[in-house]
């Protein structure tokens, strides 16, 4: 400190002479008042306070730390009045990998994805410009970015499609289906469907603007450490998803890819969900694709190569509801053959008419005649591996029990905890009966959404009385057929289900519709089946 710096007095009296007694000075200035009392004041330099020094844009003084960080541009403009800051001059961080421009005049990378940058803009028309904030995910179709509408300041999700004709054409179908559903069938946004706000072209990429939602149900299960959710929460999700699938059936639209990843929470404060990703959806009268649905949720008629309808979404929904309660997929097949094996092990063989008409039946089944009746037997893993020139793996078993009843009634595996109360036992029996209607192998007998809405699991009615009214036993014992079990031929073959005539897939099965499973089971906390997220 400068030795000539003045001392700030605490009174109107002149300051006393300086003392050289360092033991009493202690970095303070000593003053004597008129009454003879000695006073001390902090030593402060008298500096000229410029009006513009450390001043925020609103005129108040700010700390040096704030001035040199968040207010750095303002500080520099004070030092150099000619300096003008623009956010467009900020370094742009790439969000797309790889980020090197290869195609489309350098705008696209080697995978034909548009290279996204933070603070870059999507859209060029006035009133249709979106500031890129971050990335939300990517897939075979392209990328999803978190953006801000510069006109309304609303935060949205924008799906940027790859610059390839096949993806463009498929997304045009997605747009037409969503506009039909949003505008005609659900204009009031009450049926749990994602809302499409806008679509436009940007640098030869189709961009779809959606409402921004929260995490998906798979992430919810993962955050719950793969422990099942409480049945009351499963019931809430089931009610909403039945409302959605009922609307889809009314519009004769098949989603074709229902799974936990495509069901998102609206926000983290409530259990309201919405169904997303209609990129694989189609009209019931235009079912040209046969390689559809994610494997864990793929219906038997799709595996066998039969014609399909909205019933395949109900099969997927049954698998999803079981997974929400159990914490793990009910049929986690590691291949399509293994997927079929898991289904047959738990539910038995499909009806003979399905095996007779399935385009892929010969791939999975041996056929023959016993006493003049045609029979079918699922091929062994050894035979299937030899015939298809690949090594099939049996797949890990995540449940100790094999029947659906036993899996649900005994989950979680209890060691020291008491048995289920009668009320809990009946509630689980009700849930078992409910999802069995979704997991009906025969698509002609599988329940529709409107039928499922009237089940006691949804309505809350007495399940015991329901069983009496339906003349069914309260405690059902599900029979599990052996995979080599033969089924007698049926006389009537439903004409509405015909062989699918087209196979469209340009990607190997192992690269799509897969998801890693946790390496452990049962989960760490095996004595509780509660949801800790809400």
Curated annotation (Swiss-Prot):
Residues 1-40, 85-104 are annotated as: Disordered. Keywords: ATP-binding, Cytoplasm, Cytoskeleton, Kinase, Nucleotide-binding, Phosphoprotein, Serine/threonine-protein kinase, Transferase. One of its GO terms (molecular function) is protein tyrosine kinase activity. The keyword Phosphoprotein applies. One of its GO terms (biological process) is regulation of establishment or maintenance of cell polarity. Its main location: cytoplasm. The modification Phosphotyrosine is found at residue 291. The modification Phosphoserine is found at residues 33, 56, 60. Residues 130-458 form the Protein kinase domain. The active site is at 257 (proton acceptor). It holds the Pfam family Pkinase. CDD domains: PKc_YAK1. It catalyses: L-seryl-[protein] + ATP = O-phospho-L-seryl-[protein] + ADP + H(+); L-threonyl-[protein] + ATP = O-phospho-L-threonyl-[protein] + ADP + H(+). ATP binds at residues 136-144, 159. The keyword Zinc does not apply. Its EC number is 2.7.11.1. GO terms for cellular component: cell tip; cytoplasm; cytosol; mitotic spindle pole body; nucleus. Belongs to the protein kinase superfamily. Ser/Thr protein kinase family. This is Serine/threonine-protein kinase ppk15.
